[in-house]
């Protein structure tokens, strides 16, 4: 038994032991009292009590000890029954116990070293470690940030956490959604100074972008299905519904074609440009069911060589459609893949430079630049996130025993604009153990519900940290006010009656009041924010001052000379270092092509 438990038991039962020992003297007095009748005993007891208690030591006679035991146990039983039947009062908390958090509340969740934390507010931080000294203080690193336009989501949350790039104990890779293309410019040099490898994918100007080929990350039949699901989920268009038959038919065709490219085509042809070329050659004859286009012949030949091929099996299911139906399916597929027909997009997806599967191996910062006014190419960003989560989870499980060596933090600004990430509600619940975290940044909570419907609550429930930077959207204010709870306040009412019989009185009562009502949240000071951390009282704090960050001096906000020229950075030539290793190949000895 621990010393703490022993001390607690002694403090609880020692008084009753003392009472029992004293009561042994009462037993001695009763034993010494003369008389056989009860009345005579009681009269004589008055004479023997002084003599019995004159000796401070307890009596050890069996009868006396029995009396002492009964008295001690009886007193303990009486106290227990009184406590059990007592009325339960919560003074000062009759209508609610809500209050604001204090520095003492957040202290167990913060790492001593500033660089080893996620910055939440000016005074509150969350340790990067998933294994704190006390396991009860473990929290996932998923964060939900809600703030209206101009509330400082980028300045007060994304930039400060991007500058947390100098931790030696907990190295971090970043994946940053950059709606305006400014974050990489302003913070890129700071990351380079701390040994980061920078990558950019730009859907606003593809000529200033690195290449991203979704097919480069296909390693199995499951990956083909995941890619097609991500593509179709984010190219639905607004307000589309109708018969699911067409979606299922399109899925069969796309899966079969992509599987064919992956398993049969040369690596340089495994891209969407080749996929479109295949679709363009798939003419269908409505009158002649025996007509075969070039793609039909490819699959027929493959079926003879590999009859159990995944691509062949899927294509045979597609070919069950009649000529007219098949033509409609082809038209739907062509419309869905129309963005890949643009030459810039073809070039940007021809091969891959992003190396998504290596984000957890070394310190890397990937900036995903997208338009916040035109969502035409945002589906590419969503596909990147979908593949990224799946690739990193698989790599953590298969190569690193379930935990990546470098934590990958996704700072997803304007989360509602990138489209739907398939299975996000499941991913946010499982990525924590793999050293991956997602920080969703929204203008209102209703944006999340509009995209993820009933799964929005599941996503929010897996965000252990939630920050409100300000806003006026009614649903957000209502939900936050209810989550903060009610506190108990004191109310005085003065009454003054005038007339022939004037009277004056004061009435005191307790009332329940929201910690912050909706109207108070709507006029929240621009420099304040509200932090909710699971299992802890909410905090009303100042927003983090970016200028106070130790790495602020490396940003272009501090000195315009620190601005990173992305185009120049992408076009730079790799420098050869003295310790680089090369393989020398004699070109004359190579076999002819």
Language model features with spans:
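Low-complexity, polar-biased intrinsically disordered regions enriched in Pro/Ser/Thr/Gly
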Residues: 110-111, 126-132, 236-245, 267, ...
